[in-house]
């Protein structure tokens, strides 16, 4: 009979996409996969599109909620644990994988109550609160970066297979001249500071660059017009084929979510990171993984002005060899076997 895995991951692409990569790896080995998520977050649409059945529990975050919600929280968590327990009893998985998001908390507790091994994977350089709690009851804890947990195995972040299959950067970059292709990513929501600053700089860079700018939903206004006027860029709300976009790019300007950092390493690209200003400096610490190795440059959000960006870009645009060096260093930090390693640990720990 096929072994069964229940995947708990939700809320953002940073949790869901790495979990899908692990699910794919286990499906290749004959495992049956089911997902635990919430109806109002992205996994509800995304996971079924990948052919994986999904079950739902009711749970939401408490950050920024009023006192009433905090008082009701224990009851909401208890209810969610009972819902997850019922799903686990019916499905009878051999292991449960927690990849982050609100759903992991009740799901992990329910798995422990049912005697099912819990394996955790932390994608960020700073562990999320749910994973900190669950690490105390998990059979194994894995992490993408060495800073989240003191004694957990570092495996990297599972990324899409097509990125690892891109040619080495020194081969991709060998015959390229000008313009320098700059991929700008504002994220699915769009990062206002990136969307405002980069088009201003495009006006001053002329034909030395061509910019492909992903602005996020509803953010084309103003950006598109600037690129039409400058003639050195295009803007779109979303990019459908990320592997093709990474293959085309010579340089990336973006936020430094954990998945983005690991995708850029897998593709082998130099980057300028503008970390989102989390209280725990999560994105900044993610970015240092590549910046400390000479593969990326970090510009803090408060410093990300047109003039600062221009000062950073001009020497890079003038020196293709430098871009290639940074790209090679980025590829050296990639973890192409992350999904396989997480799958191996699940197989080892399954009951």
Swiss-Prot record:
One of its GO terms (molecular function) is UDP-N-acetyl-D-glucosamine:N-acetylmuramoyl-L-alanyl-D-glutamyl-meso-2,6-diaminopimelyl-D-alanyl-D-alanine-diphosphoundecaprenol 4-beta-N-acetylglucosaminlytransferase activity. Its EC number is 2.4.1.227. Its main location: membrane. Keywords: Cell cycle, Cell division, Cell inner membrane, Cell membrane, Cell shape, Cell wall biogenesis/degradation, Glycosyltransferase, Membrane, Peptidoglycan synthesis, Transferase. UDP-N-acetyl-alpha-D-glucosamine binds at residues 12-14, 124, 160, 188, 239, 258-263, 283. Pathway: Cell wall biogenesis; peptidoglycan biosynthesis. The keyword NAD does not apply. It is an enzyme of class 2 (transferase). Cell wall formation. Catalyzes the transfer of a GlcNAc subunit on undecaprenyl-pyrophosphoryl-MurNAc-pentapeptide (lipid intermediate I) to form undecaprenyl-pyrophosphoryl-MurNAc-(pentapeptide)GlcNAc (lipid intermediate II). This is UDP-N-acetylglucosamine--N-acetylmuramyl-(pentapeptide) pyrophosphoryl-undecaprenol N-acetylglucosamine transferase. It comes from Actinobacillus pleuropneumoniae serotype 5b (strain L20).
């Amino acid at each position: 009979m096929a072994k069964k895995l229940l995947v708990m991951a939700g809320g953002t692409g940073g949790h869901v996409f790495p979990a899908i990569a692990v699910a794919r790896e286990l499906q290749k080995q004959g495992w049956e996969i089911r997902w635990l998520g919430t109806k109002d977050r992205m996994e509800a649409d995304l996971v079924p599109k990948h052919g994986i059945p999904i079950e739902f529990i009711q749970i939401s975050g408490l950050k920024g909620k009023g006192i009433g919600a905090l008082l009701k929280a224990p009851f909401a968590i208890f209810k969610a644990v009972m819902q997850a327990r019922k799903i686990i009893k019916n499905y009878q998985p051999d292991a449960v994988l927690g990849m982050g998001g609100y759903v992991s908390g009740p799901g992990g507790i329910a798995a422990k109550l049912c005697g099912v091994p819990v394996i955790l994977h932390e994608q960020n350089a700073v562990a999320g609160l749910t994973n900190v709690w669950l690490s105390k009851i998990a059979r194994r804890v894995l992490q993408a970066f060495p800073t989240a947990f003191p004694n957990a195995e570092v495996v990297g972040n599972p990324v899409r297979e097509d990125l690892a299959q891109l040619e080495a950067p020194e081969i991709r970059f060998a015959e390229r001249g000008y313009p320098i292709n700059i991929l700008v990513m504002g994220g699915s929501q769009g990062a206002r500071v990136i969307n405002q600053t980069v088009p201003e700089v495009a006006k001053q860079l002329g034909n030395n660059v061509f910019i492909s700018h992903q602005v996020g939903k509803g953010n084309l206004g103003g950006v598109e017009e600037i690129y039409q006027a400058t003639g050195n860029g295009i803007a779109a709300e979303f990019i459908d084929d990320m592997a093709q976009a990474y293959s085309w790019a010579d340089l990336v300007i973006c936020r430094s979510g954990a998945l983005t950092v690991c995708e850029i390493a897998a593709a082998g690209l130099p980057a300028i990171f503008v970390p989102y200003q989390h209280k725990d400096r999560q994105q900044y610490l993610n970015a240092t993984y590549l910046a400390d190795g000479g593969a990326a440059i970090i510009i803090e959000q408060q410093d990300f002005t047109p003039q600062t960006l221009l000062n950073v870009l001009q020497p890079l645009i003038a020196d293709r060899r430098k871009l290639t060096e940074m790209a090679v260093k980025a590829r050296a930090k990639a973890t192409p076997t992350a999904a396989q390693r997480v799958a191996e640990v699940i197989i080892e720990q399954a009951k």
